[in-house]
């Protein structure tokens, strides 16, 4: 059934080569490229493939590049603990938002990171989620298959589900049925296989590191699991609150073991947080904006607005059916409905930005959850509630009075909104949408009123599912881009850069070229990043010297079309920026760059120009002098600056001067080999010098000279420097996270303990049998 639902929902993907990969939806790499659209079901009205897609930038600029970077690393048998292509060197899995260690990214990377791999791995996860959801409704809650189908439709076609199944934001939502089912089945029946399944699902969920939605889903999962446990408890000792607390305590076994198994992933994150800067802190500075009344209408049904912008709608029929079934539900079902209503309505109010309610979302901690993330909870609550509602209708019917009064109230509200829209001339609420919404209301009322006849209830339950399917399915955007891999046919400027970049970097300005993180896709190092957990000194350097006019959460150039070139040329030299890649839509920026740098390549077809910086410092070079005097904007290859006392002491002991003599000789430094996490440099120094590597300095990097460890200092504000002796030597820089090593020990120990427990328990049970 799960596979059938997937095929019916996405025939253009399964049969016509449609893509669930977001590559091509945004004009990244080549803004002038045209991609074919495929479609089976009609859209009314016709829509662009990206209409209704939430947080498209996170998919195109974070998730897709992450899959391709991880694939490149796997293919080259390299670690992806460090990303040398982003922000002059940046953290790997600790960036969280791009999910590098998630099961989804790892599987996509394993299968080649193509649009086809992305698409079918996404479909596989959806099918698995739908299977677990069906089993949860049929086996755990015993609601029946018709009700299970209703829940699956709500899971897939409510606003958050429809938009989020192939995104980093929606990844925890896709996994929630798997975690919920395995957890509740283990609590219901026990057994080693179910225990291991629950732990594996929970561990995969932890590795899916889009934290805001992840935490919201965990709250929902444990709330539902605890409610089911409490309702199923055989003992009558103590209050329901005590039974709930005992149940929750028992559930904690699963996350405790899963946390131990995934320590290799989360322990480095906490280590990175200790050194994090303003980019992470800015998440706590968000505010939930107020929302117009028409947006609130669109949350019920997209029919009620002409806007194509995504909103986490839940539908009209689901709300009416859930409300009408409440009074006839079983006690356990009422408890679950009450929890779903409390969580779902609260989340929906925060998502809508309702006055007064939104002030709760602005409390410390909660304010880090963006408004659209709250709709994940309302979608999950609708999924569970609708399945219960359809099951109740099939068994006992529903409350006709509630349905009638609710239908009248909702219908009156829609009519009133439409009349206000007409009187004020807004043209925001379409007539067709208003009529369609009223038709759904009438259909729901008729189904509920007819359910008073016991002989018709099974058929009416099926009719209720059909009504929900028609309503929610009509909201979907059925247009898809054909599968495309942008790196398969790169534009001419990308090929030029790949041939000429060598050990240098690029500055990229604009969204139509190599907007971050797309440098990592093509193996072209860049100085920007669209990931968080940025190295604080680098973030400060970038915002002060590279792009002072466009400060935001991410380090980007061209987020605003009117941005101008204000980069300090010396700062670009420090970072070994050999080429400036400019999207020609940024006319003021391009004009200023053209005055200072010579044109190296003009890709008229892609509307991208590449300028050459002939004064860029080599990626590795010897500097004859080191000074503790900080002179911002006066960086030089001849005199390196630092505030690192140990490095200054080492330089003084080696006889390295603080100024440059007239006849100073520098020697040479040549990079012999470079991977994601190591750099080997052949050094020939005429006298003791400072070896500068123009990669971002971070505390997890170590260095050795001919196998002997040496101290690394941060020089020229952001890059690495060590003192090297006279003569020939081999310098090796290595990235090693001690936190990850400790985490790996914990993970292996947990795995061993779990295996031992499973083995001993299984043998004991066999002996008893």
Indicate where each model-derived feature is located:
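Periplasmic/ER-lumenal interhelical loops and adjacent helix-loop junctions
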Residues: 28-53, 60, 65-74, 247-328, ...
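Extracytoplasmic
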Residues: 22-41, 466, 470-666, 680-682, ...
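Contiguous transmembrane helix-bundle modules in multi-pass membrane proteins
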Residues: 150, 168, 174-175, 182, ...
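Start-transfer (signal-anchor) and selected internal transmembrane alpha helices
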Residues: 1-15, 25-45, 246-250, 445-465, ...
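Selective detector of the "anchor" transmembrane alpha-helix that sits immediately C-terminal
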Residues: 110-136, 316-324, 740-765
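Active-site-proximal, structured, solvent-exposed surfaces of multi-pass membrane proteins
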Residues: 78, 82, 344, 528, ...
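Active-site lumenal/periplasmic loops and adjacent helix-entry segments of GT-C-fold
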Residues: 14-175, 209, 213, 297-306, ...
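Membrane-interface helix-loop junctions at the exits of transmembrane helices
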Residues: 7-18, 74, 78, 95, ...
